[in-house]
UniProtKB/Swiss-Prot annotation:
InterPro entries: UPF0473 (IPR009711). Belongs to the UPF0473 family. This is UPF0473 protein CD630_12860. It comes from Clostridioides difficile (strain 630). PANTHER family: UPF0473 PROTEIN CBO2561/CLC_2432 (PTHR40066), UPF0473 PROTEIN CBO2561_CLC_2432 (PTHR40066:SF1). Pfam families: DUF1292. Signal peptide: none annotated. It comes from the Bacteria.
């Protein structure tokens, strides 16, 4: 399995595959932008904070709208720096 492909299990025990399309740092914390691989029609990526526990790295859902907005702002800056299109009305496809 490729290093940037991970499996996540939701609260219902359903396992899904995601590709880590980008990791970034915002306000001293690290975040992962994930795109679902199981749903080929999916247009929205998911954002998780990367944290660590005794077993290694874990992904934590964002806890607030403020944290989400901070990560989206950093993501937007990275995309603009890379010369990629940004459509504020579509929130960059991030969820």
């Amino acid at each position: 399995m490729e290093e940037n492909i991970i499996n996540l299990i939701d609260e219902n025990g359903v396992e899904s595959q995601f590709e880590i399309i980008l990791t970034l740092e915002a306000e001293g914390k690290e975040y992962a932008i994930l795109m679902p691989l199981d749903d080929e029609e999916a247009e929205e990526a998911l954002i998780f904070r990367i944290d660590e526990d005794e077993e290694g790295e874990i992904l934590i859902p964002l806890e607030s709208d403020e944290e989400y907005e901070t990560v989206v702002a950093v993501y937007t800056a990275i995309m603009e720096e890379e010369g990629l299109n940004y459509d504020e009305d579509e929130s960059n496809g991030l969820n």
